[in-house]
């Protein structure tokens, strides 16, 4: 094989013939052999079938190789590497087997890849839409094809400026320019060879030293400086290049002076010469300095111009930018430009010039019936209309006036008065004159464009072109169809010849408005006239007949101030009235005395009236009849700079007309429309209700609403409907005639719903009215509790629910405060009820004595609140006599009919699907349902019922006859489950609530501690007042023998109970606790008919109304013993009713003195059993509930085994009550701590029923304070910890082991 191997030309036939190769060659061969070894290894892994196969023809070379391998160790390194390289070369040749194996590989194994490549080529072929007709190559762009065609035509438009070389592309010529380096640019062409550069520098320095030495000896002559200036002048003016064959370096070259300021320095100091700016050398003559700079600092000079550079790269880049670009633009060299001018081929459509006919032919494909959108200014054509639209921005930007006069920046200069460029396009001048009309700041300057073209100041040629341009407009103005006159330009007789020109003019108008919106007087005129005519012609309701269109199209509109109406002014000056519809629309727009936009269409008409007042007197045929000021008030005639100032000024006239137009508000229809909005007090009441309830529709009848104070004016099925209360007090200041006109126009619905301020469009007039409040700043929806005001009713509703929820939902005082203590929080007691008046009116039509408008709650309902339970007063320390007197003063028997009527009305409301929420639900239940239940229970009470003379026992006896099953059904029907947690509404026992700045502050009744957090108040009471009492010993030293009984009852904590004495029997309270968590769930499951139930209508202590006090101690395992006053919640004896069985097993120490101590003494006395009973117990049960209006325990539920098991009773805080059960010995053991000084007098116990009058009056308040302290339970905190009871009537949780067996 005679082929050369891949190893740098080493022959493959004689590997051992060249053992004398040199080291560098061997190193190169070794590197190449390594590379070949890597390639062959990679190929062997990639293509295993291409491994070298045994070939019989190559046995001899193989034997030679074996022979060569044997002495390989004895050969030199060079010969070994050569043999290895040749062997690798033969392996590659054998494995690939030439091009045949490669072809088989491509055809056989990689067909999938080849198919993919073919698909890619097909896609690329599709993307390349421009094929070459000669060679078949395809290109993506036509410009690339035109460059490719130069290879076939031989055109080379780019010529080298230094030689005769030409290139078809600019990049090729730049590559050629790199060859002209280091003297190759031509000898003597402004540069000195590198070998002569150092010689010239040394020569210059020697000459400089000699001159300096001579100058120090000889004085300078005075005639040298004029000579230098005289020589500088001709050199500066001579800019001719040196001839190409000139190579003498001594000739001065006219290079510009690098620092002309040296001339002035030379004139001042005659001894100094010319200084070089690069090396600071001095020369006496200018020629010497130029020669010095050209030789040393700027040796590279351009032969085509005067440019000189210090580096060669700068000179080449200068030639590429300056000279090649110029040559490429011409398409030919500088010498051949005149010769090829006859061979130019120009496009007749766009005027582009080509050097070859073939280029012109390819260029003509662009104009193949596709560029049909032509620009009327420059003549360019486009395929798509949006291309033309974007192109028009170029002309508009050129026409815009960006710079004003520097002396008067505030004065607007009309475009008609500006000097235009001499070479500006004729169409551009016409458009600028058209635009100058829109930019006129006043009427006087509007005639400038007409004077420019009317006085013959234009040349004849321009007049002729303008006449051709304007002739289609004038001819089309007479032949405009009637339908086209409805448009804006049709009314103005400005119909353009083409659609593109129309777009152009509209863009010019918009651009004019953007440049100076204040002084764009005629632009505002054009818009105002267009709105007036569009409103008059295009509205369906205001569509005029054909005979009215032509007079309106040729007339002007003038506002007559005396008659206050618009009149049409003809071309001859005659006046006539406008059509009724058009007059109505403009008159309504002129009513600016309604700032609240009573008519939702007034916003657009106000803008229209602004245009009509100043601009509609402008004759539609031309600008010659304008007489009004730009922005003039129609009432007083004052002129303002902007339209917004006129709108603000119009409010002054509105205030002046208030006194004159008050008589018009007496009408019934207007009164019904306005409702109680004129009365400030009633307006505040109506605004304090739900925004939806005060809205009134325009279709309100004469007698359809209630005109009383605070009542709803009209049933509003649409809460968002516009109303007088939404608009405000000044909404109805217009006269009755204007009101009728507004209603009639609203029914027609013919006005535009576009905002005159920002241009937004709205579907309905109501949305426009609401939107206009943003611009006017009107906020009619005011909050009755703070200074907030909103533009929409939804904003006020959100504000009320976000910041005043407790005031909006609470019908009476805040939860936790007695209703008769109005001095504590008057604002909460006067909070309004948010009830829809239309629903209440339908429910209470048959109730003449019920009035919801007088206040948040009527007097009857307040009395009902007191009658339903006087426990509120008792819980805060009020005597029972006061509450009973208030109960008697309410005159319940006389009001019983009202309660039944209210109950029926409430049922009617509930049956209609109305659901009261939150505190309003509890409010309605506590006043309506309680009266119904009282009436029912009074009828069901047996005649032989036990006589009860205590005031609080009466309600408990009535409620005791009700069954628990009935109680559950009633609560499920009228009292839905309220899962909301409102920690700020209720109060803790032992604390009071005051509301300041919408924040509920809880104050401790025992100290001066105040906080806004109920959790902190609960912790404060637990740590400082209730908990401290537990940790103290008994102050009187009384020993209580209750350890053994406490140990016998495992897991039970016995509360201190009170045993009645001989003369007065008081029921004791014993709270029983089971610390086992299993019994927590067993307690409610084991309830029977004798189980205690909570009161029907709760106060702040009732869990059904407020779960906080009852759930607070649940985490400590404390359970309230009873939630009621007259009904003990424990399992009492069934067979005993008024007898007391004292147990003598426990020693009882009763002091004989009675004393009133402070609340701290009470708390200290009340915890004496803690030292004995808390040793063997995990939890302590302590509670004395203070609610006297709760369900009493039926007498049949008394426990039979009262002596063996402890019974629970309740300590009544207000008055002595009859004995309801027996006191167990377990309860007697803890009795003595209650007979300490200040609590109970020492009296002999006696059997029988005591009289309530026998109770000492001084006992009521200490017992009330004690009950407040002891009723402080741990159930409320569980509401915040997720431990709240799900049932609303959570009373006591009884102990199954202590209850009687049923």
Swiss-Prot record:
Function: Transcriptional repressor that negatively regulates neuron differentiation by repressing retinoic acid-induced gene transcription. Binds and interrupts RARA from binding to retinoic acid response elements (RARE) composed of tandem 5'-AGGTCA-3' sites known as DR1-DR5. Recognizes and binds 2 copies of the core DNA sequence 5'-CCCCCA-3'.
Start and end residues, zinc fingers (C2H2-type): 130-152, 158-180, 274-297, 300-323, 345-367, 373-395, 631-653, 753-775, 781-803
Feature: compositional bias, Low complexity: 1198-1212
Region feature Disordered, mapped onto this chain: 1-26, 650-736, 804-832, 855-897, 935-988, 1133-1261
Record's keyword annotation contains Zinc-finger: yes
PTM-bearing positions, type Phosphoserine: 828-829
Gene Ontology annotations of biological process type: negative regulation of neuron differentiation; negative regulation of retinoic acid receptor signaling pathway
Keyword Transcription regulation: yes
Family indicated by similarity: Belongs to the krueppel C2H2-type zinc-finger protein family.
Keywords, alphabetical: DNA-binding, Metal-binding, Nucleus, Phosphoprotein, Repeat, Transcription, Transcription regulation, Zinc, Zinc-finger
Basic and acidic residues compositional bias, start-end: 657-676, 935-973
Comp. bias regions, Acidic residues: 1161-1171, 1179-1188
GO MF annotations in UniProt: DNA-binding transcription repressor activity, RNA polymerase II-specific; retinoic acid-responsive element binding; zinc ion binding
One cellular component (GO) term of this entry: nucleus
Biased composition (Polar residues): 677-698, 869-883
Localization terms from the record: Nucleus
InterPro entries: Krueppel_C2H2-ZF, Znf_C2H2_sf, Znf_C2H2_type
Tissue specificity comment: Expressed predominantly in the brain, while a weak signal is also detected in the heart and testis. Expression is abundant in neuronal cells of the cerebral cortex, hippocampus and hypothalamic area (at protein level).
Transmembrane parts of this sequence: none
Protein name: Zinc finger protein 536
